Amino acid sequence: MSVVLLSMACSKTGLSGADGGAGTAGGGSAGTGGGSVDARPESGLKLVVEVPATVNRDLDLLFVIDNSASMASLQAKLIASFPTFMNVLRGLPGGLPNLHVAVISSDLGAGAYDSADIPGCRHHGDQGIMQNAPRGKTCSTGSLNGGQHFIVDGDGQRNYAGTLEDTFACIAALGDQGCGFEHQLGSLLRALGADGNGGPPPENYGFNRPDAVLAITILTNEDDCSAPVESTLFDPSSRYVADPLGPVSSFRCNEYGHLCGGQKPPRNADAELSGMCTSVEDGTLLRVADVAKALKALKPGALEDVLLSVIAGPPNPYNVRLTAPVLADDPSLWPSIDHSCTAADSSFADPGIRVKELADAFGGNGVFQSICGSSLEPASQRIAEEIGRRMEPTCLTGISDAQPGTPGFQPDCQVVDHFGSAFSGQSDVPLKTCRETKDVAPCWYTDAPTTDCVSGALKFLRPADRGDLRSTTFTCNP
């Protein structure tokens, strides 16, 4: 976690007055070479958080975009919402982070079978390679063409012409000719070299920086169908409803990827299964738990630096519906899954069981938003705000309001700045609230409370020269 140093123009809420009430770093003694602060152990104070002084400004954004049939209009919605996404990031204290931005498709083909067997499923698909050339529209990516496979913008460097929004629009319009057996999770693992195959594709080298926050966003209107490379799940020789694998359709992914009330979704009957379905973790498809584990392992010791967001169909309602026969030589009714949502523009999505479970596996670092709406701006804004929180101050959690009758949130905390190092000598200096210092730096305050941070995010006023400030600790009454 990191904090952002703000100007003195910010509004401050939820602080105590200068009378030694809540929020005061009182009773401490400042000094050099090992000064100490009274921890008031009798009050039951506990260390809530230690906030590093160094702000992490590196952010790697990876968009996994479904490019199968019916996705073109939804890609257009994502592109239209991208300026909103970027405005949130540009509005962060300190401005736009140092960005890497990449786009991959959901197309890994259909195992050992290619387009001669399954239309649209080229052998191995895009292999998780980050895209650097337009597909679904006429545009220019500037110097990305023939060069790097991801956008770079930060530290005074950029590798594209025009605006970042226009460049993203150029590479994010992937079209809708990709394989209908979507491999969102498999493509994601392949792109980041987390699939156990010896690293990412050469085109992707340099994207995932070790110390950067990694924010992944999956956009899809169907659930994931990622299977092991050796899988026969997509065998096109099974084409009739009565065949072992059933017809060559996306229902195969539901039948072998979901478990509803302990049973597979039925192939031969209508069924209403809302609230009953989960992913199957028997290895037919990549296990969601294994995918989450592999992604978290990319940032060992810093799980908060991986954010996994999904924009997809909600998992419910979940209904199996038999429709008219599709094959001329098979009179059987064709199994399908009803859409779980439909937008006013007739775009739709099916239940995203597996992708929702992946987002859930990241707990507070996971976001799930419905893809069905007149606009994706609300979803993009929510995701960008969650990313921003990881580039901004920490939220105090596990503590109560010391003055619940007063507007805002008044934490009862001792706050201490830690300077120096083991080599140069260390000192601990109490840090007062900005109300106590009348907004004279250095001081601290909490931002306005939100539903996601009831205490209000931690904020600081600092002089331009912070010396050798190492970190700041908050020790608070629970």
What is each of the regions a protein language model found here?
Residues 15-39:
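Short, low-complexity, disordered segments immediately C-terminal to signal peptides
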Residues 6-9:
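C-terminal motif of bacterial Sec signal peptides marking the signal peptidase cleavage site
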Residues 1-3, 354:
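Sec-dependent signal peptide recognition
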Residues 11-13, 37-478:
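Divalent cation-coordinating acidic motifs and surrounding scaffolds
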